[in-house]
Amino acid sequence: ADSRKPI
């Protein structure tokens, strides 16, 4: 899973 989150 991607741990990147939109700002």
Swiss-Prot record:
It catalyses: an N-(acyl)-sphingosylphosphocholine = an N-(acyl)-sphingosyl-1,3-cyclic phosphate + choline; an N-(acyl)-sphingosylphosphoethanolamine = an N-(acyl)-sphingosyl-1,3-cyclic phosphate + ethanolamine; a 1-acyl-sn-glycero-3-phosphocholine = a 1-acyl-sn-glycero-2,3-cyclic phosphate + choline; a 1-acyl-sn-glycero-3-phosphoethanolamine = a 1-acyl-sn-glycero-2,3-cyclic phosphate + ethanolamine. Contains 2 disulfide bonds. Its EC number is 4.6.1.-. Expressed by the venom gland. It is found in: Secreted. Transmembrane segments: none annotated. GO terms for biological process: killing of cells of another organism; lipid catabolic process. One of its GO terms (cellular component) is extracellular region. Its cofactor is Mg(2+). Binds 1 Mg(2+) ion per subunit. One of its GO terms (molecular function) is lyase activity. Keywords: Cytolysis, Dermonecrotic toxin, Disulfide bond, Hemolysis, Lipid degradation, Lipid metabolism, Lyase, Magnesium, Metal-binding, Secreted, Toxin. Belongs to the arthropod phospholipase D family. Dermonecrotic toxins cleave the phosphodiester linkage between the phosphate and headgroup of certain phospholipids (sphingolipid and lysolipid substrates), forming an alcohol (often choline) and a cyclic phosphate. This toxin acts on sphingomyelin (SM). It may also act on ceramide phosphoethanolamine (CPE), lysophosphatidylcholine (LPC) and lysophosphatidylethanolamine (LPE), but not on lysophosphatidylserine (LPS), and lysophosphatidylglycerol (LPG). It acts by transphosphatidylation, releasing exclusively cyclic phosphate products as second products. This is Dermonecrotic toxin LgSicTox-beta-LOXN3.
